[in-house]
């Protein structure tokens, strides 16, 4: 099924974002106040449970149907030496995902997540966005719809991740264009490039921002001009999840960059999202601040693949277990606070 058959359909969806169920959220908050613990003593675990109650539209949210989706794409901008690895590694890692041998396989399994891997035209990289638009409008819509397609009504949680050699350059370009800031604000080592590689990334992004300066600054155009297929797919998944009231757990810098242009246009797009972690990529902390998202974890991770979000999913599962399984003061015959 095509969720966004046109740019207008995408923009209409972005302009009409459903709210959570405030009644369910209030009921969950009231339940937290009655559980056998001092109020607030479980910290953010309480907040997470209440958050999921609102978006799942039930007082006692669950994680029976939790999915991790990893999108993969290749980038034409790699011709400028912005990555430490060749583009062929993207397809090799997709094969590794499908064989069950990657970090995301182990971590999603440990967190009880169903894993879906979506490879997006790996033999057809996006264009070099420092010279032309990364994608045509049709290609960008296809990528948005590929992301939307992984979201099913009734999912309890959607964990998002990516794989794509060169995509940290695209992510930095998206952030620079979205927030009007210098490329160097967002550029980091990515897969491990040296100082010369970082300089090349900054130069490529500066040229891209200048080349596309006169183009519309809409969310769609930013994704199309300097994004990647896997990044646009994440944007499509986040938007579709909002339409279906599915809470989202975001991974690192590249994953979060996908919603930066959407958030500039519609800040409320982040309301159904949790940041799984803050990665070691320098731009991620700044991006989370711009998106007003507080990460659940900070473990120095910088792998991508949805790995940090998968670890955070185990924290979410723990939050829901406490919310559901703890006794109330009345049930346990324990005196509450006075």
Write out the residue ranges for each language-model feature.
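N-terminal loops that bind phosphate or other acidic moieties
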Residues: 1-338
